[in-house]
Design a protein with these regions (language model features):
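Phosphate- and other anionic-substrate recognition elements at nucleic-acid/protein interfaces
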Residues: 1-195
Length: 195
C-alpha cells in the first residue's frame, strides 16, 4: 500500500480511495462515521464528518480485489485496508449493511467472511460497529426503502454536495454512514443496533 497525492485528492493504491480534504487528519473528531458496503471484490468505503446538522465527506472510495486473487488474499487485503482507514481517518463509529437474502449459499458465505473481517478489524481497533438493513439505509437517504441504486447515488451526491457522483459501492457506503448519522435522532425508526 502506498499513497500518491494529485492536487487535493489522495489516492491509495489499495483501491483508488479518494480524499476530498487536503489533509484528512487535520479535522479529526469523534463525530466521524465510516460507512462500509462490504463485498469480496469491491468494498465501498465512505468516511463522513458530522458538524451539527451538516454532513461533510472526508473520503470515499473502493477496496478492489482482482478476480485472480484467492479468497485468503482478498480477505487479508480487505483487513489491511480497513485497518489503514481506521488509523488514518479515526472514525468514532463504523456502520455496515446488515445481511440480506442471498439465493446462492456460496455467495452468502463469502459475504459473511468479508463482513467478519471488517467487524474484526474494527473490534481490534476498539471502534464500535453498527448495522442497518439495506431497506433502512434507503429509507434514511432516499425516503423509500425499495429505491434503486441510481436513486441512492443521486441522493448521496446531492445530500453531501459532491461535484461528481461516487461509484455505486462508494455511494452505498456513504449512504450507510448518512443513515448512522441520522440514527441518533431516529434510533427506533432506523433500527440502530451495535454488533
Amino acid at each position: 500500500m502506498f499513497r500518491q497525492k494529485y492536487g487535493n485528492e489522495l489516492w491509495l493504491l489499495i483501491g483508488n480511495f479518494k480524499s476530498t480534504i487536503e489533509n484528512p487528519k487535520s479535522k479529526i473528531s469523534s463525530a466521524r462515521i465510516l460507512g462500509v458496503d462490504t463485498s469480496l471484490r469491491s468494498t465501498g468505503l465512505g468516511l463522513i464528518q458530522v458538524r451539527g446538522s451538516r454532513l461533510e465527506v472526508v473520503e470515499h472510495g473502493l477496496v478492489k480485489n482482482p478476480a485472480a486473487w484467492p479468497l485468503s488474499r482478498c480477505l487479508g487485503h480487505l483487513h489491511a485496508a480497513i485497518g489503514e482507514i481506521l488509523e488514518r481517518g479515526e472514525p468514532g463509529t463504523v456502520a455496515i449493511e446488515g445481511i440480506f437474502f442471498c439465493k446462492n449459499v456460496r455467495t452468502a458465505v463469502i459475504l459473511g467472511e468479508a463482513r467478519g473481517v471488517v467487524i474484526a478489524a474494527c473490534a481490534a481497533a476498539g471502534v464500535p460497529v453498527y448495522e442497518y438493513s439495506p431497506r433502512r439505509v434507503k429509507q434514511a437517504v432516499v425516503g423509500f426503502g425499495a429505491a434503486g441504486k441510481e436513486q441512492v447515488v443521486r441522493m448521496v451526491t446531492s445530500l453531501l454536495g459532491l461535484r461528481e457522483a461516487p461509484s455505486e459501492d462508494a455511494a452505498d457506503a456513504l449512504a450507510i454512514a448518512i443513515c448512522h448519522a441520522h440514527a441518533g435522532k431516529y434510533d427506533a425508526l432506523l433500527g440502530a443496533k451495535e454488533i
